[in-house]
Amino acid sequence: MDVPPAPGLFVTGTDTDAGKTVVAATIVGRLAGEGLRPGVYKPAASGGDGDARTLWEAAGRPLDLASVCPQSFRTPIAPHHAAREEGRRLDEALLVAGLDPWRAACDVIVVEGAGGLFSPLSERLLNVDLALRFGFPVVIVDGGRLGCVGRVLATVTAARARGLVTAAVVISQVTADDARTADDPTAPRRIAADGVDELRRRLADLPVALLPHRGAETLPALDWMALASRRPSPRP
């Protein structure tokens, strides 16, 4: 009997440096803590393999680091530009095929994209294209800075227009709190928390979670396995 491929989540951002790796690693840790075997895949990375290593460690080091991120580049720019800068070639077919070793090796796969949902991965492919090919619901992450509501709403709207299922939104506070008090409306924690409240009101059909700065243990408990199994509703 054929074993159905593992379900998965595609963790993406509203922009680069949105806190995707922290969120993805936290989700992976939750899945592992439930006794599941999570797989982790980062199709391409620029700026080194630090993000891939974080995911690999969170998953308990399944397979090997090269399987987590088969294409890693040192230069911190878009992967296909980084490849060209280093005299290498980004293998577009491998972006897709690199997921294959994980499909039968785990119970659920967490993929972390590079940059935002519409950031380029290659000359032709954007992150959104890869999410569609994998068929995984997306987890949209924003760094919780001023403007997070507009960025998230735009990304959710664009994802839906392309036929993607949005599993959840996570506001990951990437800016540390400083000497300002929690009563200051411009304090990072207030901006992030107020953004979550506004998004919960406007996206009543989606889970919207807050991940405080360096507070991975406080990410609200969601059924990530159930969210990974969501599929698009048939169109009329």
Sequence positions of predicted segments:
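C-terminal lobe/tail of nucleotide-utilizing enzymes
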Residues: 2-3, 157-236
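Hydrophobic anchor at the start of a short beta-strand
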Residues: 38, 109, 138, 166-167, ...
